[in-house]
Amino acid sequence: MPSYDFEQFYESCFSRSFEIVHDGVNEKSILKLHGDERKEAERLLLQSLGTDKDSYSRPVIALGLLRSKEAVEPLKQRLETATGIDRIQTALALFRIEKYPEAEKIIIDCLKITNTNSADEMAQWLAVEVLPHFGKTNQVVESLLDAMIQDNMAGRSATNSLRTLFIDDEPIRNLLGQILLNPHDAHKPDFVSRPELVNQAIELIRKHLEK
């Protein structure tokens, strides 16, 4: 009889229920799998790639969490044609498995808007959510600073990701916290607009990087 964690893994990766899909993969249960159940989970996930069971990048995410070496080549092949959210999740999975050197650039590129690449707010939101996995590199920080300027879901998420990266720097952490709370403070006499706070944060963080 399968364990509770295996059942939770299977449901979160393969169920078509809207609630389950919305909640995403059960990371805790996946990370608890071991022995034969871990091998079986990996087999099912690899088998599902490219089939109708492969929905919302869930098998890709789970294979990354399992650090599946068997998934490396299939995921690299997937990356050649993947777009948007699936491209981000595939690059992140490869980074989790083997510190794939191109992953950071691939995800940062998903934030860029060009003549041939219109804004995909959900993809932008996911990109800024996962960039802290790559650490406080100059490329990551600059990309998050650019994204923070936007007053939308991606911009707010970028602010939160920067706060995660600079959690040990009190002045930066507090200023980013002000940006996140900004709409709630509009009634205060000393209210400072979001663009002003963002500019202050960008200047402070860039000075920090120059040290």
Task: Tell where the protein language model's regions lie, with residue ranges.
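Eukaryotic acidic, Ser/Thr-rich intrinsically disordered low-complexity regions
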Residues: 176-211
